[in-house]
């Protein structure tokens, strides 16, 4: 988990928050469970290069360590606008800050 956090912070220095969510955060992961990472970027919108620069290095780290790392990117504003959704509520309830 620490390596995922270090990598995420290094490839997304503009991130306001980097959160682990899902089964790994809840502590009920199985051996084959993936790692779900939410990265909140302080930008006006998510661009294709953000996906390339943030999501791909984390996916590559997963390949190196034998884990499946899924990255979800939101702008800070878009995340706040979605605060009513079940996804947002679940992430905020279970998240671990990386």
Residue locations for each model-derived region?
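Catalytic core of pol beta-like nucleotidyltransferases
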Residues: 1-19, 25-31, 41-98
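Histidine-centered divalent-metal-coordination microenvironment in nucleic-acid enzymes
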Residues: 34
């Amino acid at each position: 988990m620490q390596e995922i956090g270090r990598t995420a912070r290094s490839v997304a220095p503009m991130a306001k928050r980097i959160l682990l969510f899902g089964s790994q955060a809840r502590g009920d992961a199985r051996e084959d469970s993936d790692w779900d990472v939410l990265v909140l970027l302080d930008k006006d919108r998510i661009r294709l290069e953000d996906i390339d620069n943030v999501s791909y290095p984390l996916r590559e780290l997963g390949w190196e360590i034998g884990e499946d790392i899924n990255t979800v990117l939101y702008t800070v504003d878009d995340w706040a606008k979605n605060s009513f959704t079940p996804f947002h509520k679940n992430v905020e309830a279970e998240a671990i800050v990386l």
